[in-house]
């Protein structure tokens, strides 16, 4: 369905246009840049919500609000945008988390004009990726993330920020090489006229060997970004050094771009190769849950421990994608949204806590539950959500992924039993390291022995950010159909095309 008004173009271009306009603002302190960026993000979120509420039809699994503008004649490159039930959830998540991340970044005072400019550029790249319907445009939006994240890390990070930023750019740029090769290979294959249109590529058939090569190239790029072991080692270092508002964007949105690409391109455009790779995805996802949960115990740095838990939770998404069932795939999408909220909240609360107590290592913390009861309450609540407490979004997402792999007709009974058993062990390890982390932070009397120690509890701004994230976590946990209703028709379409192609 083609849109006569360029709603998606406005949504994609507005943040980057506002970012370029930030240079014309008068420099009258950081307050001007804070309010300007927050208002732009809030306007973008409200505009996105309006467009989806009044111009998007849930019962239509076809691409909606489609826009098509030819940009380069030689290579058939189009500014081609469109959304469906698969992309609407990540787009709303992006707007929600980015708006709250700008509020979380208010304590940033050094070169705040550039800081907020980079956040707005990231915003455009993320929205553009989730709404792109052209393979080269997808790659451009994918790359648009790299430079802002690198600068946010290298300029506003911790003591080892340059090492972490360099490691991040090397990993992600290396993965992007494989992504570019796959994009060019699929676009140029088998036709005198190259095509990068998702719709035409979905009907393209390839020799099995070539499809496997394309699939593997895309998989490497997504394995770096998601991340999937063993290409995950950049993540703990990056989260350990980044400012917590940057961590919110990384954990809430950036990691989900890889999982989205795995569904949108690998599963939708390369189904035969995905059928061959799916058992390996399930195996790697299962190992990832156990491995990341186990290594989390050895992390003394608070944010690095939460980063390892993010890697562990991404394993459920990989398993859901590899299950090749509508239940498992719905669970993977629900986990994408659920962990986007929970991961962003945990990094926000850990960052605000570390700013107050001036410690980042768990063995230096202790006894802050009494002087900071609000932070203690919110952090404990999100820890419960992360360990899949019933009534919260994490529980529903992991349960649906469990059901998806158990009911998958692709796997035999014994492998399914073994996989679910190992997943259950991972779910047992999760509360162990999360509750251990909470005990080291909030209980004991270590910090009370510090002379003249005084800690300020969460203020109105931080409490507002925490509650805003907590509400959808509870809402999805109580009524998950609000997410399933967006994606269920599209997933059925992907799987029907997948099996009958």
UniProtKB/Swiss-Prot annotation:
EC number: 7.1.1.-
InterPro entries: NADH_Q_OxRdtase_chain4 (IPR022997), NADH_Q_OxRdtase_chainM/4 (IPR010227), NADH_UbQ_OxRdtase (IPR003918), ND/Mrp_TM (IPR001750)
Broad class of enzyme this protein falls into: translocase
Keyword flag Chloroplast: yes
Keyword Hydrolase: no
Keyword terms of this UniProt record: Chloroplast, Membrane, NAD, NADP, Plastid, Plastoquinone, Quinone, Thylakoid, Translocase, Transmembrane, Transmembrane helix
GO cellular component terms, semicolon-separated: chloroplast thylakoid membrane
Family: Belongs to the complex I subunit 4 family.
Species: Dioscorea elephantipes (Elephant's foot yam)
One Pfam assignment: Proton_antipo_M
Phylogenetic placement of the source organism: Eukaryota, Viridiplantae, Streptophyta, Embryophyta, Tracheophyta
GO BP: ATP synthesis coupled electron transport; electron transport coupled proton transport
Topology versus the membrane: Multi-pass membrane protein
Catalytic activity: a plastoquinone + NADH + (n+1) H(+)(in) = a plastoquinol + NAD(+) + n H(+)(out); a plastoquinone + NADPH + (n+1) H(+)(in) = a plastoquinol + NADP(+) + n H(+)(out)
Subcellular location per the Swiss-Prot or TrEMBL entry: Plastid, Chloroplast thylakoid membrane
One GO MF term attached to the UniProt entry: NADH dehydrogenase (ubiquinone) activity
Name the UniProt record assigns to this protein: NAD(P)H-quinone oxidoreductase chain 4, chloroplastic
Transmembrane segments: 5-25, 38-58, 88-108, 114-131, 135-155, 168-188, 209-229, 243-263, 273-293, 306-326, 331-351, 387-407, 417-437, 464-484
């Amino acid at each position: 369905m083609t849109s006569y008004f360029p709603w998606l173009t406005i949504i994609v271009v507005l943040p980057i246009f506002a970012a370029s306009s930030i240079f014309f603002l008068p420099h009258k302190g950081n307050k001007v840049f804070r309010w300007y960026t927050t208002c732009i993000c809030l306007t973008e979120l409200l505009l996105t919500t309006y467009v989806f509420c009044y111009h998007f039809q849930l019962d239509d699994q076809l691409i909606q609000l489609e826009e098509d503008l030819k940009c380069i004649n030689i290579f058939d490159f189009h500014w081609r945008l469109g959304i469906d039930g698969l992309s609407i959830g990540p787009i709303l998540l992006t707007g929600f988390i980015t708006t709250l991340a700008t509020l979380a970044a208010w304590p940033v005072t050094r070169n705040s004009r550039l800081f907020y400019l980079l956040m707005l550029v990231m915003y455009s790249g993320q929205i553009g990726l989730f709404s792109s319907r052209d393979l080269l445009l997808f790659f451009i939006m994918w790359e648009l993330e790299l430079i802002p994240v690198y600068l946010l890390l290298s300029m506003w990070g911790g003591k080892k920020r340059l090492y972490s930023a360099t490691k991040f750019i090397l990993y992600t740029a290396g993965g992007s090489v494989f992504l570019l090769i796959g994009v060019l290979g699929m676009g140029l294959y088998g036709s005198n006229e190259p095509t990068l249109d998702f719709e035409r590529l979905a009907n393209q058939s390839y020799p099995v060997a070539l499809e496997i090569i394309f699939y593997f190239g895309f998989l490497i790029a997504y394995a770096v970004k998601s991340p999937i072991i063993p290409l995950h080692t950049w993540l703990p270092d990056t989260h350990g050094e980044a400012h917590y508002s940057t961590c919110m964007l990384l954990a809430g949105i950036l990691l989900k771009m890889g999982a989205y690409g795995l569904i949108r391109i690998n599963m939708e455009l390369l189904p035969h190769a995905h059928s061959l790779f799916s058992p390996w995805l399930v195996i790697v996802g299962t190992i990832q849950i156990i491995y990341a949960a186990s290594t989390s115990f050895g992390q003394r740095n608070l944010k690095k421990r939460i980063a390892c838990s993010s890697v562990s939770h991404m394993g459920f998404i990989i398993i859901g994608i590899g299950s090749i069932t509508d239940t498992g795939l719905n669970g993977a999408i629900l986990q994408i949204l659920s962990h986007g909220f929970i991961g962003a909240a945990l990094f926000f609360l850990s960052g605000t806590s570390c700013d107050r107590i001036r410690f980042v290592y768990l063995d230096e913390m202790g006894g802050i539950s009494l002087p900071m009861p609000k932070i203690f309450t919110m952090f404990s609540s999100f820890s419960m959500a992360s360990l899949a407490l019933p009534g919260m979004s994490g529980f529903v997402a992991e349960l649906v992924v469990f059901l998806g792999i158990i009911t998958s007709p692709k796997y035999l009974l014994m492998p399914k039993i073994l996989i679910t058993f190992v997943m259950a062990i991972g779910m047992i390890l999760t509360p162990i390291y999360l509750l251990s982390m909470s005990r080291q932070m909030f209980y004991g009397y270590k910090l009370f022995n510090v002379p003249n120690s005084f800690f300020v509890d969460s203020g109105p701004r931080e409490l507002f950010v925490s509650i805003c994230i907590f509400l959808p976590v509870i809402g999805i946990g109580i009524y998950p159909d609000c997410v399933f209703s967006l994606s269920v028709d599209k997933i059925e379409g992907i799987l029907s095309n997948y099996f009958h192609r």
